[in-house]
């Protein structure tokens, strides 16, 4: 499972994937435990 320490990495990963799907990834991608 993901913890608060994983959020900076995930945020950086999302910022590399700037696109129309970014918001959906933010909402659902990080919840994929």
Swiss-Prot record:
The modification Pyrrolidone carboxylic acid is found at residues 1, 18. It comes from the Eukaryota. GO terms for molecular function: hormone activity. The modification Phenylalanine amide is found at residue 33. GO terms for cellular component: extracellular space. Disulfide bonds: none annotated. GO terms for biological process: G protein-coupled receptor signaling pathway; response to food. It is found in: Secreted. The modification Sulfotyrosine is found at residue 28. Keywords: Amidation, Cleavage on pair of basic residues, Hormone, Pyrrolidone carboxylic acid, Secreted, Sulfation. Belongs to the gastrin/cholecystokinin family. Gastrin stimulates the stomach mucosa to produce and secrete hydrochloric acid and the pancreas to secrete its digestive enzymes. It also stimulates smooth muscle contraction and increases blood circulation and water secretion in the stomach and intestine. PANTHER family: GASTRIN. This is Gastrin. The lineage of its organism: Eukaryota, Metazoa, Chordata, Craniata, Vertebrata.
């Amino acid at each position: 499972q993901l913890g608060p320490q994983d959020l900076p990495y995930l945020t950086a990963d999302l910022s590399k994937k700037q696109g129309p799907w970014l918001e959906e990834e933010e909402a659902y991608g990080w919840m994929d435990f």
